[in-house]
Amino acid sequence: MVREEIAESTRTLQWKCVESRVDSKRLYYGRFILSPLMKGQADTIGISMRRALLGEIEGTCITRAKSEKVPHEYSTVVGIEESVHEILFNLKEIVLRSNLYEIRDASICVRGPRYVTAQDIISPPYVEIVDTTQYIANLTEPIDLCIELEIKRDRGYRMKPITNSQDGSYPIDAVFMPVRNANHSIHSYGNGNEKQEILFLEIWTNGSLTPKEALYEASRNLIDLFVPFLHAEEEDINFEENKNKFTLPPLTFQDRLSNLKKNKKGIPLKYIFIDQLELPSRTYNCLKRSNIHTLLDLLSKGQENLIKMEYFHIEDVKQILDTLQKHFAVDLPKVLI
């Protein structure tokens, strides 16, 4: 556990981790401060950050399990102590860490008698099992247990659809929420008009990321939400209204992508953000540090200028070129004229 003394400050706004500890493989704790803030700012930031931490951070979960020998979810299998429903619940609790964005396959294939734990999950190399000791089932007889799994990265809570499985495939309620809890508190100091505040932020995570990583991702997500307001021009939007409702133009990435391919003038490039390009985190962070937030910013930069950026490599440029060609059928200019 790490603790640091907190000193009241009138210097430039800054943050610090004042306490950090690991209670278990699946419970990390961090306590942070941000100061000095003017009266009211701490509450504004604290409420926004808590919402972003609990609702905007992405996580990776097992979302489906399949075993052909299982007739239905509430059945039992000879030689297995747990019911199928209990096994599905245990799979739901497995904590994973990854940066994948598509559904990936994993599996369990073991023979009893033995305990089955998370260590027995055969997963893709870019998926890490945080706690390999997590319990799944107990095979009490010499039988084979083979389960096919689906792994997905998302955010929030996704309830499984209410359907009757016909092929032994069962969806799992997924909790894509690496942050278990987040609280904020405020300490005020000073007098009268000189009054200032210190924001205290506490974060508990499930071990798939540290509290500091969660704080970084939540901050980045909040910043991205406000990026459109930083553009000088206001885009004209036509609203179709009637007495009870109005219809907005399509805002999903897939709709934007489809329209862009049909007509490059259909969707302004400044409204397609680099978050949606699914770039590696290091490449993404380099672009963000250089104030490249949208596809328009990226195309305006040029290949040679990208290579000159700090920590940017030729492999990163190739990754961007491939992404632009694949999704948008456009090239990144080598040199700006």
UniProtKB/Swiss-Prot annotation:
Subcellular location: Plastid, Chloroplast
Known catalytic reactions: RNA(n) + a ribonucleoside 5'-triphosphate = RNA(n+1) + diphosphate
Keyword DNA-binding in record: no
UniProt keyword annotations, A-Z: Chloroplast, DNA-directed RNA polymerase, Nucleotidyltransferase, Plastid, Transcription, Transferase
Protein's job: DNA-dependent RNA polymerase catalyzes the transcription of DNA into RNA using the four ribonucleoside triphosphates as substrates.
The family this protein is said to belong to: Belongs to the RNA polymerase alpha chain family.
Gene3D superfamilies in the cross-refs: 5' to 3' exonuclease, C-terminal subdomain, DNA-directed RNA polymerase, insert domain, RNA polymerase, RBP11-like subunit
Region annotation Alpha N-terminal domain (alpha-NTD): where it falls in the sequence: 1-233
Region (Alpha C-terminal domain (alpha-CTD)): 266-337
Subunit structure: In plastids the minimal PEP RNA polymerase catalytic core is composed of four subunits: alpha, beta, beta', and beta''. When a (nuclear-encoded) sigma factor is associated with the core the holoenzyme is formed, which can initiate transcription.
Pfam families on file: RNA_pol_A_bac (PF01000), RNA_pol_A_CTD (PF03118), RNA_pol_L (PF01193)
CC terms in the record's Gene Ontology section: chloroplast; DNA-directed RNA polymerase complex; mitochondrion
EC number: 2.7.7.6
Domain comment in the entry: The N-terminal domain is essential for RNAP assembly and basal transcription, whereas the C-terminal domain is involved in interaction with transcriptional regulators and with upstream promoter elements.
Any one biological process term the GO annotation gives: DNA-templated transcription
GO molecular function: DNA binding; DNA-directed RNA polymerase activity; protein dimerization activity
Superkingdom to which the source organism belongs: Eukaryota
Protein's name in the database: DNA-directed RNA polymerase subunit alpha
Native organism: Dioscorea elephantipes (Elephant's foot yam)
